[in-house]
Amino acid sequence: MSKVHLIESPYALDKIKGIGPKRLALLEELNIKSVEDLVLYLPTRYEDNTVIDLNQADDQATVTVQGEVYSSPTVAFFGRNKSKLTVHLMINHIAVKCVFFNQPYLKKKLELNSIVTIKGKWNRNKQEINGNRIFFKDQKNQEDTHLEPIYRIKEGIKQKQLRDNIRQALSDVTIHEWLTDDLREKYKLETLAYTIQTLHHPINKQNLLRARRTYAFTELFMFELRMQWLNRLEKTSDEAIEINYDINKVKQFIDSLPFELTDAQKVSVNEIFRDLKAPIRMHRLLQGDVGSGKTVVAAICMYALKTAGYQSALMVPTEILAEQHAESLIQLFGNTMNVALLTGSVKGKKRRLLLEQLENGTIDCLIGTHALIQDDVVFNNVGLVITDEQHRFGVNQRQILREKGAMTNVLFMTATPIPRTLAISVFGEMDVSSIKQLPKGRKPIKTSWAKHEQYDQVLAQMSNELKKGRQAYVICPLIESSEHLEDVQNVVALYESLQSDYGNEKVGLLHGKMSAEDKDQVMQKFSKHEIDILVSTTVVEVGVNVPNATFMMIYDADRFGLSTLHQLRGRVGRSEHQSYCVLIASPKTETGIERMTIMTQTTDGFELSERDLEMRGPGDFFGVKQSGLPDFLVANVVEDYRMLEVARDEAAELIQSGQFFEQQYSHLREFIKQNLRHIRFD
């Protein structure tokens, strides 16, 4: 079937008036490659040009007012090509002076006794407006409100040009309706054609809100249809491998561990084991706070697979983390399991031998990075795929790994506790196991907040820990200095400063621009206690495990979100020794102050994730752009979570009733298939 579109156009993008080769190239840089892309290129915000009563305006506020020109404008020139135009208006019986800089041409347009609309900053004391825009329209033609769409543009494209291009396209395209009449009527939604038209050219705020609501619901409904359909396919299209593990051997392995499992770990293991025995594929998320022992739970599951004659795979986002997982699992398993590590650094003969052993079944458990999904990586009999920190991988990467075993059980792990609402959006409908309990003997990390001027006191506190034979992390937001962020400390400068204080041999440097080999060398030195202080960016955020490190200083901590701060803090507190985390920050915003306060009040990652989500929104919540979240144009899974739940219920009903698979929905089914490029539906 040919490509299914939401919007169909009778002509190509370059047939629109004003779009020549040069404009076409600029539009392509904005990812606008078709008329459909142009129509769906929605405004990022709206400038409210509603005329207001000046008596109600706050001092220094940006206002839009209308008045009569009662004195001829004057222009004064100064400096080099600079000018100041002054005109007096009568606005609501108030004489107001209006000033425009470097717009002398306005003088000819500002006729005496004419009615004009001006936008600018209001100075109540001076009774003066510093104007930035002027509208020449007769008063009776002014609309009660005027919301002007503002688009993200590039140099070479003007707002008005883009608005005109979109206006022409809208007049000629056909916009298909995805929602049924019953659904629109039930939730009082508009047609999609009217909605898109309104998002580009709203008449008033109420009109815009209705359009936003309709488009958001449509996006959420389409997304949930995909998720519900995929969920149905995953549970019905393939029979799962039934893992007949040897429970006695598994119990012996658990008893041999050098520590006792927490109650939360035991519950999670039992939940996963029930899934492994079930006739449908496991699709479970294991989430737990930093240091809660998720890796041990994963290890027990891998061991169970081994007793049943199956291989396991564990994919992690970084080489450092892959190496640490491999090291800890080799230590846990001893001679009972053959664990192999596959990263981009494994090359040549060593790689060929590893792949040969993987394919003939000699390797029981393969741990690695993106290298696991390369075409030449072939398993003999994989029964369990575990993805750690899944939100850091694209859908495509996860899907390829899963397809290496057609009926494979899947376990996702994350140390970023995800609120239930967001978990559904990121991972789809799946079972969730949560570990909310730390291993015995762990002491809660003591977190404090210090201002920049208290830096020397923080250094003294760190020195005390070093004297006890402990180690420390020092975290910075930037690698090198930035002219845009002059007040933010950078990791290189702080590294050099600490070297002069503690000696070159005692301080290590780690950041994302270093080669994998260099990063590994520094981490190995820190792990072996060859260096005392590791100065780093957030590259240490996930999974780095050095139990002897008991002190962390996070410089310019207000530059990070709560979840990132909590992940960083989790690098300490991994032994029986008391650990400390000091946040150095002088926040200038209420949000920054609130963030620092919350961090000192709780060490509960689940509570922090909820607060972070409220404060930052889903995109920032994970600290990365490619967070695995659906890329909505209008909907926001946090603000619109009630709508998300309604959309999910409606989508589930449509899928479960079987109506979705009737002829009337064939167009919609094909659209969903084509827009889930990384997921197979056959």
From Swiss-Prot:
Belongs to the helicase family. RecG subfamily. This is ATP-dependent DNA helicase RecG. SUPFAM superfamilies: Nucleic acid-binding proteins (SSF50249), P-loop containing nucleoside triphosphate hydrolases (SSF52540). Plays a critical role in recombination and DNA repair. Helps process Holliday junction intermediates to mature products by catalyzing branch migration. Has replication fork regression activity, unwinds stalled or blocked replication forks to make a HJ that can be resolved. Has a DNA unwinding activity characteristic of a DNA helicase with 3'-5' polarity. Its EC number is 5.6.2.4. The wedge domain within the N-terminus inserts into the replication fork junction, where the lagging and leading strand split. Keywords: ATP-binding, DNA damage, DNA recombination, DNA repair, DNA-binding, Helicase, Hydrolase, Isomerase, Nucleotide-binding. InterPro entries: ATP-dep_DNA_helicase_RecG, DEAD/DEAH_box_helicase_dom, Helicase_ATP-bd, Helicase_C-like, NA-bd_OB-fold, P-loop_NTPase, RecG/Mfd, RecG_dom3_C. It comes from Staphylococcus epidermidis (strain ATCC 12228 / FDA PCI 1200). A motif (DEAH box) lies at residues 388-391. It catalyses: Couples ATP hydrolysis with the unwinding of duplex DNA by translocating in the 3'-5' direction; ATP + H2O = ADP + phosphate + H(+).
